[in-house]
C-alpha cells in the first residue's frame, strides 16, 4: 500500500483536479503541501462543479481527511470565504474533515498590497503573479518574521510579533509612498479571524505519522507545476515555493521515506499562463485551436493560457527533478482532428543542439525547438475508457511520448469527466 505524490510536470493547469479527485476516492488523507490560493482547480463530483484554490481536493468527499501542511501559505480570510462557498453548495467542512498545520505562515492584507504594488510597477519585467500575496508571504517566512497560525493562540504575545513584522513592511511602504499599516488594526483583524480558523489547527506532522502507522493511504497534492519551482523552474518566471515532488516531505512534516510513488500530471500538449519562456508556443491558428478546444482559461485569474506543442525536453527534465514513476496524460482528446502533430525533441541554442532546458534566463529565451512530426487522427478519443477505444494513431502518439520522456503512462484521461479514464497502473498499488 503506497502513499502517492501528485505533481504537475509542466507549468501547471495540467488537469490535476480531475486526477486528484479520482485518486482521492481511494485515499484516506489528502494533503496540500505548498503554494497558496493562487492555483485553482475544478472538480466535478456527482454532477456538481466545485472550484477550489486553497483547500485540498478531498474536502468535497465525505469520510476523507483533508490537511493543509506547513509548506502552504494560508490566507485566513480566503480560507473562511472558500469554506463558506462550499457550505452554500451543501458541503460542510468542519474540523473533523480539515486540519491545518500550526506552523503554517499566514498571508495578510499587506502581502496582497505589496504583491500588487510591485507587479504594477514592473512594466516590461512582470513575473505574472496573481497579486494574492503569495510571494511576499514566503519572503516573510524565510525572513523569520512571518505571523503563523499558532501565533493567533496567544492574544498577549501577538502584538509584539506584529510590531516586528511591521518594522520591515512599513519601511518598504514608506519608500513606496504608501500609507503605513497600523499595528493595532492588524492585531484586531487577526484576532477577529482567530475563532474561525483556530479550530482547524493541529500538529500535522504528528497526525500524518499516526496515519502512516495506522496503514492509511495518503495522497500528497501539489499545486502549480514543476516548471514553476523556485529552484528548478524557469526562474525568475516561477512561483515562490518548491513545487517538485520532494517538497511534499518538508511541506507536510513527513520524512522522504513516506513518499512511495510520484505521479506526474502531463498535458498532451503544453500551456502556460503569464510571462516567461515557452519554446513551443504557437501564436498562429493552431495555437488558437488548442486554446479553444482545450478551454484554456485560468480557474483563479480567468486569463487565457498560452498554448503550444508538447515539449518532451521539459517533461523529461521534470521526470528527473521530481523522480516521477509514471505520468497521467491528460487532454488527449484536444488533439483529435489534427492532420499532424508536432513534438519538441530537442533544442538549438546559438546554433548548437542541446537536450536540456538551460537555467540562465537569456539562454531560455534563445532556445529554438527541434520538432519531429507524427500523423494525427480523425476518430474521436473523447470518452475512451480502454486502449481498444483509441485510434491506432493516438496509441502510437502516447507510446512515442513515453519513449521520449523515459517514463510510462500510468493513467490516461480522455475528457474532463472522471470516469473517462484509462488506468494502466494504480499508483496506490506501487
Curated annotation (Swiss-Prot):
Question: Which annotated residues bind substrate?
Answer: 299-305
UniProt main location, coarse: cytoplasm
- Annotated residues that bind GTP are located at 12-18, 40-42, 305, 331-333, 413-415
Give me the residues that bind Mg(2+), please. 13, 40
Instruction: Tell me its EC number(s), please.
Output: 6.3.4.4
Which Gene Ontology molecular-function terms are recorded?
A: adenylosuccinate synthase activity; GTP binding; magnesium ion binding
**Residues at the active site:** 13 (proton acceptor), 41 (proton donor)
Cofactor binding remark: Binds 1 Mg(2+) ion per subunit.
Alphabetized UniProt keyword annotations:
Cytoplasm, GTP-binding, Ligase, Magnesium, Metal-binding, Nucleotide-binding, Purine biosynthesis
Positions that bind IMP: 13-16, 38-41, 130, 144, 224, 239, 303
Task: State the similarity comment.
Answer: Belongs to the adenylosuccinate synthetase family.
Q: What does this protein do?
A: Plays an important role in the de novo pathway of purine nucleotide biosynthesis. Catalyzes the first committed step in the biosynthesis of AMP from IMP.
Q: What is this protein called?
A: Adenylosuccinate synthetase
Q: What's the gene?
A: purA
Amino acid at each position: 500500500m503506497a502513499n502517492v505524490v501528485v505533481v504537475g510536470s509542466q507549468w501547471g493547469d495540467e488537469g490535476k483536479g480531475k486526477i486528484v479527485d479520482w485518486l482521492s476516492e481511494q485515499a484516506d488523507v489528502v494533503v496540500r503541501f505548498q503554494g497558496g490560493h493562487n492555483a485553482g482547480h475544478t472538480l466535478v463530483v456527482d454532477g456538481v462543479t466545485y472550484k477550489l484554490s486553497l483547500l485540498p481536493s478531498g474536502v468535497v468527499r465525505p469520510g476523507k481527511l483533508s490537511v493543509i501542511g506547513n509548506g502552504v501559505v494560508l490566507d485566513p480570510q480566503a480560507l473562511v470565504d472558500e469554506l463558506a462557498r462550499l457550505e452554500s453548495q451543501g458541503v460542510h467542512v468542519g474540523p473533523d474533515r480539515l486540519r491545518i498545520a500550526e506552523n503554517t505562515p499566514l498571508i495578510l492584507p499587506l502581502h496582497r498590497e505589496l504583491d500588487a504594488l510591485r507587479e504594477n510597477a514592473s512594466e516590461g519585467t512582470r513575473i505574472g503573479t496573481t497579486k494574492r500575496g503569495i510571494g511576499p508571504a514566503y519572503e516573510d517566512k524565510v525572513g523569520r518574521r512571518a505571523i503563523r497560525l499558532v501565533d493567533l493562540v496567544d492574544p498577549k504575545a501577538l502584538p509584539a510579533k506584529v510590531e516586528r513584522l511591521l518594522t520591515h513592511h512599513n519601511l518598504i511602504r514608506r519608500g513606496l509612498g504608501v500609507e503605513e499599516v497600523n499595528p493595532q488594526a492588524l492585531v484586531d483583524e487577526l484576532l477577529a479571524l482567530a475563532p474561525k480558523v483556530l479550530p482547524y489547527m493541529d500538529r500535522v506532522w504528528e497526525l500524518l505519522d499516526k496515519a502512516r502507522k495506522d496503514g492509511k493511504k495518503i495522497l500528497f497534492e501539489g499545486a502549480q507545476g514543476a516548471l514553476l519551482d523556485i529552484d528548478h523552474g524557469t526562474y525568475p518566471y516561477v512561483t515562490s515555493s518548491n513545487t517538485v515532488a520532494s517538497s511534499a516531505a518538508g511541506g507536510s512534516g513527513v520524512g522522504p521515506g513516506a513518499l512511495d510513488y510520484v505521479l506526474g500530471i502531463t498535458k498532451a500538449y503544453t500551456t502556460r499562463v503569464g510571462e516567461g519562456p515557452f519554446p513551443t508556443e504557437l501564436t498562429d491558428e493552431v495555437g488558437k485551436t488548442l486554446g479553444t478546444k482545450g478551454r484554456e482559461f485560468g480557474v483563479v485569474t480567468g486569463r487565457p493560457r498560452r498554448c503550444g506543442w508538447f515539449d518532451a525536453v521539459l517533461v523529461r527534465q521534470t521526470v528527473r527533478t521530481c523522480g516521477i514513476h509514471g505520468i497521467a496524460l491528460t487532454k488527449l482528446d484536444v488533439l483529435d482532428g489534427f492532420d499532424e502533430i508536432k513534438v519538441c525533441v530537442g533544442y538549438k541554442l546559438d546554433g548548437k543542439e542541446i537536450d536540456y532546458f538551460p537555467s540562465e534566463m537569456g539562454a531560455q529565451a534563445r532556445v529554438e525547438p527541434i520538432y519531429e512530426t507524427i500523423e494525427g487522427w480523425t476518430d474521436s478519443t473523447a470518452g475512451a475508457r480502454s486502449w481498444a477505444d483509441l485510434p491506432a494513431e493516438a496509441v502510437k502518439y502516447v507510446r512515442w511520448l513515453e519513449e521520449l520522456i523515459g517514463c510510462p503512462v500510468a493513467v490516461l484521461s480522455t475528457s474532463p469527466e472522471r470516469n473517462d479514464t484509462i488506468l494502466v497502473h494504480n499508483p496506490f498499488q506501487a
